């Protein structure tokens, strides 16, 4: 459920990949609009690829619901959901290898300031559900309590910058935290072996901890600064896709929005659909996670997927202040609500 450990490496490779590819797949730019069935005649469905950021989980449920319920077929589309390749989802989307994928505001921001043409077209979750988590026996109740503890991460400069930001607010010193790369170990293995806390999405790892009977102290980063209440994850496309085939994006988001709306209204049924599509997932975890996460997809937004300019501006300003990006972001170009369906 956490972001890829190779985000920075993938971003560094994107410009090379884009230069090599330079064009969208012909299948992504061919005309194939309209419903799957009209007037008794069946039209050929248009194949559309979507790449996940990680293994399937409840961040992705709306996609699987829309696929199972035929919402994509109603738009004349046949969705193929892919796992990311070695270069990562952002590279695949930015290069035009696939038209859509899961990304994060953080990586879209980093990418765009390096000339990578990613654009966020929908927020999967309206508010940041991530934060620093520790078993309760580590007595981490506030950011200052990170002092003297060991943090396990994936090696991104963003981690220490966020930690420093919230520790500064609480009067703590980030230099008193031991930071290590936890590698491929999962959270539960790592906290038993060599770390005290890590950055998690509560909807997955936090819910799993509840089911295991291993209570956590959870410090949500958004609770310490409005600038850290950013969109994670998002659905992204690339600038060429927007220019060449905006109607495909509209059709894709009409179906996807229906999938997430269904998951909001029917979390248990949506969980069953995800489990049917990915039977290797833990049933109890998926159901409990879906119940926790479904209300948070849209939350206080006017419609699912909607993004605010202020959220993009605030977070990119924070990244620039912390020297995580080399120049300010043109926030208006980094996202768009133009392709989301209007509320009915």
Where are these regions (language model features)?
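Short, low-complexity disordered leader/linker segments with a strong preference
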Residues: 1-46, 342-344
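Short, glycine-/small- and polar/acidic-enriched structural segments
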Residues: 29-183, 188, 192, 196-200, ...
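Short, solvent-exposed loop/beta-turn-alpha elements that line the ligand-binding surface or hinge
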Residues: 74, 144, 221-228, 296-309
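Short, hydrophobic secondary-structure boundary micro-motifs
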Residues: 75, 120, 271-273, 327-329
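Short amphipathic alpha-helical segments at helix boundaries and their inter-helical linkers
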Residues: 98, 102-103, 295-306, 341-344
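Pocket-lining segment of extracytoplasmic ligand-binding domains
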Residues: 106, 186-189, 193-278
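Secondary-structure end/capping motifs
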Residues: 244-324
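Conserved C-terminal helix/tail region of periplasmic/extracytoplasmic solute-binding proteins
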Residues: 312-344
């Amino acid at each position: 459920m956490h972001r890829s450990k190779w985000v920075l490496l993938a971003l560094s490779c994107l410009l090379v990949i884009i230069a090599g590819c330079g064009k969208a797949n012909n299948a992504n730019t061919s005309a194939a609009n309209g419903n799957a069935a009209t007037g008794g005649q069946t039209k050929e469905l248009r194949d559309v690829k979507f790449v996940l950021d990680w293994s399937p989980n409840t961040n992705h449920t709306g996609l699987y619901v829309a696929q199972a319920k035929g919402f994509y077929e109603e738009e004349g589309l046949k969705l193929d959901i892919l796992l990311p390749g070695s270069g990562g989802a952002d590279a695949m989307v930015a290069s035009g290898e696939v038209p859509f994928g899961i990304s994060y505001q953080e990586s879209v921001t980093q990418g765009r300031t390096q000339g990578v043409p990613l654009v966020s077209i929908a927020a999967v979750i309206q508010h940041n559900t991530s934060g620093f988590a520790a078993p309760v026996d580590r007595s981490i109740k506030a950011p200052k309590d990170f002092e003297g503890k060991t943090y396990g991460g994936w090696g991104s400069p963003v981690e220490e910058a966020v930690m420093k930001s919230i520790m500064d607010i609480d009067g703590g010193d980030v230099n008193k935290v031991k930071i290590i790369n936890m590698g491929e170990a999962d959270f539960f293995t790592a906290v038993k072996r060599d770390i005290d806390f890590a950055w998690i999405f509560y909807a997955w790892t936090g819910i799993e901890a509840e089911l295991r009977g291993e209570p956590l102290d959870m410090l949500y980063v958004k609770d310490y600064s409005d600038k850290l209440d950013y969109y994670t994850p998002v659905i992204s496309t690339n600038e060429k896709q927007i220019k060449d085939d905006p109607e495909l994006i509209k059709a894709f988001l009409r179906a996807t929005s229906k999938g997430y709306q269904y998951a909001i209204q029917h979390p248990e049924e949506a969980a069953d659909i995800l489990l049917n599509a990915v039977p290797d997932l833990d049933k109890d975890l998926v159901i409990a996670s879906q119940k926790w996460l479904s209300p948070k997809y849209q939350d206080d937004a006017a419609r699912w997927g909607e993004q605010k300019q202020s959220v993009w501006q605030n977070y990119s300003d924070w990244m620039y202040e912390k020297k995580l990006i080399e120049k300010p972001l043109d926030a208006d170009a980094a996202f768009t609500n133009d392709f989301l369906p209007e509320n009915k």
